[in-house]
Amino acid sequence: MQRLVAWDAACLPIQPPAFKSMEVANFYYEADCLAALNKLHPRAAGGRSMTELTVGDHERAIDFSPYLDPLAASQQPAQPPPPAAAAGGNFEPACSSGGQDFLSDLFAEDYKGSGGGKKPDYTYISLTRHGHPCGSQSHKPGVLPGCFPPQIVETKVEPVFETLDSCKGPRKEEGGAGPGPGGMSSPYGSTVRSYLGYQSVPSGSSGNLSTSSSSSPPGTPNPSESSKSAAGAGGYSGPPAGKNKPKKCVDKHSDEYKLRRERNNIAVRKSRDKAKMRNLETQHKVLELTAENERLQKKVEQLSRELSTLRNLFKQLPEPLLASSPRC
């Protein structure tokens, strides 16, 4: 673990009067294991010499002032690279000129070949995973068996290509035996196969990376499955077998057929007779109800006439007679 040392005015580099520094890289990290040295050598209250403020082996700092102000950088002498960069621990390329771009100067050392300007072969991590040595660079001390330098493994390789190749690589190597595009016997065969797995997804496999960890690689469909599908498709072409039962052949001149027909006719006659009897009963009841209705209507008319007669009689009586009569 590392802890951040507090800002110190003496730690800031000396800049020209007309220069305004915009860098924020003056953070110096100090290891916890060197904390005892601070107790043995306490810091002075005032300013310290420049020899005490130099960057140690356990520290690193990048000066961005040449990129921010090229005119001020041209006036200052070029500083030697820190010892950590010479040892190969940290990648800190020195500025070649003040007017160059920061990114171009940063990646200048990355693309320089160690063997005479030849660009390294950027292959996938599947080569190192399966251990396919490269014929041209397999015996070089500074190159890994995967045909690319160690800094490429850390920075240039994308870990997305590991899952599909690790699952599908051994099964593909067993199937591919011949040279050329079909066999893939070259040391880059597994790389091409792992890359094609992400470019074109064959039928029967999913293109999603979350489901690409299946143990079996996609291949030709099983003949048993194709036959089952063909049989299933053929079953829907025709009607079900239950509807194709042949009718039982009966001889119309046989005694059994005649007896059956006679029983059927008797049952039909009985049902018809019952229906006729119900119809007759319903008609008879309708006639009875109609006669009762007529009788009641005649009685209502008779009572209405009697009521009208009584009203006329009461109207003809004199008023003193009606007043002397007792009221019920």
Swiss-Prot record:
Pfam families: bZIP_2 (PF07716). Disulfide bonds: none annotated. Residues 280-287 are annotated as: Leucine-zipper. Residues 200-231 have a biased composition (Low complexity). Gene3D superfamilies: 1.20.5.170. InterPro entries: bZIP (IPR004827), bZIP_sf (IPR046347), C/EBP (IPR031106), C/EBP_chordates (IPR016468). It comes from the Eukaryota. The modification Phosphothreonine is found at residue 220. This is CCAAT/enhancer-binding protein beta.
